[in-house]
Amino acid sequence: MSIKIKYQKGLLRNMGIFDFKFIWLGQTVCRYNVPLDIFNVLNGIYETNFINLPDAHKQLAGKIAKENSLFFGGAANPRMHKHNTLPPYVLNWFESVFKHYLDFNKIHPYKLRMNSIWINEMKAGEYNPIHIHQGTIYTGLSSVMMLKLPKDMGPEYAREDVPMNGKLQILGAAGGQFVKSDYGPIANERDFYIFTYEMRHCVYPHTNPNAVRRTLAANMDVEYNPVGTRTAG
């Protein structure tokens, strides 16, 4: 078996697949597809119980009018109290996906503790500035789940060929030659992106006055040994 590698413009060579191994250094972003039942339950809880969901503004960076919490497992504080609106099987699903990220990245051993889950609903002009996340501890995984995306994000002010309205932008922490330093996915509903707490990210505003953009974020604290897991070998 062989694969074709395009290593120069217009030039192809055959290379045996046994001659190639991909080794990555730095941090990763993993995208998952949310099961339809989980997706519907999360949207349903938000839409039917919105009036009872705690306001999450005081502990978030977003310039968004509607930021409401579904779960908080950290220590009670003046900004938030412990609560849970999610059934056990939904929390178990979140834990299983975070475990997959860590196992895929060969991080072990580790201990997990769900810290917080909340929903942002962005109207036209609202946005999330560049920020990072943290939970009870400084090491962990954050995420963005696409719950509701307008088909029309509104008019672009310039460069319609490079649409940015309502776009998620993730900025990597790695540097150096040939590094891929940022990621702006073409997102779809049910996409779920997982990345590390300190990985900077933002969401640009959309401009459609008749639509909302709804996403979920979940923070999972991860206790692990950074020295024991730092090698890719």
How should each PLM-predicted stretch be described?
Residues 26-28, 113, 139-141, 212-214:
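Residues at beta-strand starts and edge strands
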Residues 209-220:
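A short alpha/beta connector and helix-capping loop motif
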Residues 120-194, 204, 210-212, 226-231:
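Catalytic core of non-heme Fe(II) oxygenases with the double-stranded beta-helix
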Residues 112-121:
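A short glycine-rich, His/Asp/Glu-containing loop-to-beta-strand
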Residues 2-109, 125-129:
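Non-heme Fe(II)/2-oxoglutarate
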